[in-house]
């Protein structure tokens, strides 16, 4: 059986990266929430 997690740096960046987050209103909310919380890493 094939495992569900097949790591790919490109796919990770495209789906969860900073620019992907900033592209939608909800994503900008995620970044804002993580900034307010003081997260060291905002996105993948």
UniProtKB/Swiss-Prot annotation:
Disulfide bonds: none annotated. It holds the Pfam family Ribosomal_L34. PANTHER family: LARGE RIBOSOMAL SUBUNIT PROTEIN BL34M, MITOCHONDRIAL RIBOSOMAL PROTEIN 34 FAMILY MEMBER. Transmembrane segments: none annotated. One of its GO terms (biological process) is translation. It comes from the Bacteria. One of its GO terms (cellular component) is ribosome. The keyword Ribonucleoprotein applies. Keywords: Ribonucleoprotein, Ribosomal protein. InterPro entries: Ribosomal_bL34, Ribosomal_bL34_CS. The keyword Oxidoreductase does not apply. One of its GO terms (molecular function) is structural constituent of ribosome. Belongs to the bacterial ribosomal protein bL34 family. Coiled coil: none annotated. This is Large ribosomal subunit protein bL34. Gene3D superfamilies: 1.10.287.3980. It comes from Chelativorans sp. (strain BNC1).
